[in-house]
UniProtKB/Swiss-Prot annotation:
Its main location: cytoplasm. One of its GO terms (biological process) is maturation of SSU-rRNA. It comes from Neisseria gonorrhoeae (strain ATCC 700825 / FA 1090). One of its GO terms (molecular function) is ribosomal small subunit binding. The lineage of its organism: Bacteria, Pseudomonadati, Pseudomonadota, Betaproteobacteria, Neisseriales. This is Ribosome-binding factor A.
Amino acid sequence: MKKPQRGYARQDRVKEQIMRELAELVRTGLKDPRAGFITINEVEITRDYSHATVFYTVLNQDTREITEEVLEHARGHLRSELSKRIKLFKIPELHFKYDESLERGMSLSALIDQVAAEKPVED
């Protein structure tokens, strides 16, 4: 007999938990002053929980490359801290990727505004 579906899958709950904990760890646990203001936007995990891709943005675009280096350097420490906060059989290996969706959205919005400004208004 098939189990009834819950509204929220376990994998989704784990992703949300990892995202919350990483956001807190990045905010309080990164001691490197070179890191900019980092926002964790999304976490994607594999079905076997062995890998997690963490999508992030930074407030100041000038610190983007430095922040990437800082996150890669702190990857092991962040994974270790996650293992203390989250009880999982396997803590996923973390992969950090800059989230360009916000920039793409802003450029698309600018293109739409440009086309709208060029098109004459008809009554």
